Design a protein with these regions (language model features):
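Short phosphate-engaging motifs
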Residues: 1, 32, 100
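Fe-S-dependent hydro-lyases/dehydratases of central metabolism
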Residues: 5, 26, 33, 40-44
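Short helix-loop-beta junction
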Residues: 1-9
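Glycine-rich, small-residue loops and helix-cap segments
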Residues: 8-9, 20-21, 28, 38, ...
Length: 168
């Protein structure tokens, strides 16, 4: 179709993109846990009954104020930033992001845009992956590099699967 419209399409390879999902989640979850730490129920955010002390207040507030996935992301982000990893994981991810931004920028100096699907599979059925966070995270395969590279993106519907779920 593109060739019939006079549009040249080439395949490009950006090897650093293989690290996009891991890089994205290390950065995103680390920053989310850091930013959400201020929602302690004392100075910011929802305030639950303090119970007997500050520990109980924090626990009650965060239990009521954050959903399951948010809690999972906060805990994972805290682990990444923990003294056990000494911040090395986060610092490495920032370096990979900088390299990714540079490599994607080099491609965009030669081409007008990068064309790829938004998701590797048709849309999930509602509630289908709720208990499989890894599958949900992996569905971001083609969008994480866009966020990390600080470039705009557009998702265009590309049809429907046999069962009617959107592809795009």
């Amino acid at each position: 179709w593109f060739a019939s419209k006079g549009i040249q399409v080439d395949s490009v390879s950006v090897p650093v993109l293989e690290s996009a999902i891991a890089t994205y989640y290390v950065i995103a979850l680390s920053e989310a846990s850091s930013n959400l730490a201020r929602f302690d129920g004392i100075r910011y955010g929802l305030r639950e009954d303090p119970g007997k002390g500050y520990d109980e207040l924090y626990c009650a507030t965060r239990s009521a104020g954050f959903g399951r996935e948010v809690k999972r992301r906060i805990i994972t982000g805290n682990y990444v930033l923990s003294h056990h990893l000494s911040g090395d994981c986060y610092e490495s991810a920032l370096r990979v992001r900088a390299r990714m931004e540079k490599e994607v920028g080099t491609v965009l100096q030669q081409y007008d845009f990068i064309f790829c699907p938004t998701a590797p599979t048709p849309a999930f059925k509602i509630g289908e992956r709720v208990n499989d966070p890894l599958a949900m995270y992996l569905s971001d395969l083609f969008t994480t590099f866009v966020n990390l590279s600080h470039i705009p993106a557009l998702s265009i519907p590309a049809g429907k699967a046999q069962d009617g779920r959107p592809i795009g």
